[in-house]
A protein has these predicted regions:
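Short, well-ordered alpha-helical microsegments
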Residues: 89-93, 111, 131
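Periplasmic-binding protein-like
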Residues: 76-86
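Short, flexible loop segments at the rims of nucleotide/cofactor-binding pockets, characterized by
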Residues: 58-63, 80-81, 100-102
Length: 144
């Protein structure tokens, strides 16, 4: 099985940024520990990470475009599923409309897991915009 994991960041494209390499290495280590034998998980980024992607709508538009352009390669390249691994579950409906393979989203999955573990839960973020986005995702998922 081949799984396409799509980040909303530029990853190696931001080679001058130490945090992008740390993130990429951490994801690779985690995948080694959780992927079943015979499952090929490959992480893809977008062209580059726009400044303010977690704060500004204009920056998010660049992320949306990069994400869709990247993920559209998954099916033709033989991937069996797509996992979107960015906090805001960008382009939820669009990706499910455009692809015939399963598309799952990390925050949606995390919110549903939290519901199974406890009657209430909290989402912690590093700025006000993340709080607003988390609330919007909870509403979208029928949890608020």
């Amino acid at each position: 099985m081949k799984i396409w994991l799509q980040s909303g960041s530029g990853l190696s494209a931001n080679g001058g940024t130490p945090n992008s390499r740390l993130y990429e290495d951490a994801v690779a280590r985690r995948l080694e520990g959780v992927a079943r034998a015979g499952t090929d998980c490959v992480v893809f980024g977008i062209g580059s990470t726009p400044f303010g992607k977690d704060r500004y709508h204009a920056a998010k538009q660049k992320v949306f475009t990069g994400l869709i352009e990247s993920v559209l390669r998954a099916e033709p390249e033989g991937y069996d599923a797509v996992g979107v691994i960015n906090t805001f579950d960008h382009r939820y409906y669009e990706l499910r409309e455009l692809l015939r393979i399963p598309v799952v989203f990390i925050t949606e999955s995390t919110l549903y897991l939290a519901c199974q573990l406890a009657p209430t839960f909290a989402v912690i973020g590093h700025n006000w915009q993340i709080k607003l986005q988390a609330k919007e995702l909870a509403n979208h998922s029928g949890l608020a």
